[in-house]
Amino acid sequence: MSLFNLPKVDLGEDCEGGVUARPSSSSSSINNASDESTPLISKTNDEEKANIGISSTSNSPQEEQTKKPLFISILTLLISIPALVGSUCWPVLIASLSGVAVSAGSVELAHSLTFAITLSILSNLAQYHFHKCKKRPSDRGHWIKFGPFYLTAIAVPLATFDILRHILVDNSIWTIHSFISPAAYRPGCENENITCLSVMGWFSAIVFTYTGYACLLVGTIWAADLIPKIKKVWTQLRPSKKN
């Protein structure tokens, strides 16, 4: 065997002039660590984006649940403005303000439509408050948990009593010959205003109506937790007092 008959060695692309550059172990470990940390960082960013998306989507239903009963109560109050001023329904109020004569059939139809709309809105709002109150914590007692529902449920018959009285009188179901007269004004009183209201008129047009809508307003504010939210916003907007 000749001394010059040596085996060929593959120097590779990184070898020049017989000198090979070997990668150091520290640089390879750094590269491996960076490669491993890259997917972790991307995964963390994806999780943060997902959490932000979940929080944003979770806040929107809560805001909708808060605004929904408030809008319904405002709509109900707008419908009931005539009842609060003693005209029972919008057509009668508009006709009295404009000086236009309204037929008896139109008044009866207006009474029926107003009663149907008001009863449907208030009853559905009471059901909504009941299902919402079931999700409230019960550690503070039964009344604190279901108080908004009870107030709204009380508001349903009180706020619709005067309109129902008008419908019963229009259809001659409740007459002055009944055991309790449905007349809202005293006999012989010429002016149909608050000074001429009878006992029935005071209870139906004033006591029942205003108490019903007061219960509705308090129940809606209570169910939506508006007082704590207003206090929180107020404390955030107030400048901090420096000692």
From Swiss-Prot:
Compositional bias per record (Polar residues), positions renumbered to this chain: 30-43, 53-63
Compartment list: Membrane
Any single GO BP term: selenocysteine metabolic process
Keywords linked to the UniProt accession: Membrane, Selenocysteine, Transmembrane, Transmembrane helix
Gene Ontology cellular component list: membrane
Region (Disordered): 12-63
Protein's UniProt keywords contain Protease: no
The keyword Signal belongs to this UniProt entry's keyword annotation: no
Protein topology in the membrane: Multi-pass membrane protein
Transmembrane regions: 74-94, 102-122, 144-164, 199-219
Name of this protein: Membrane selenoprotein
Species this chain originates from: Dictyostelium discoideum
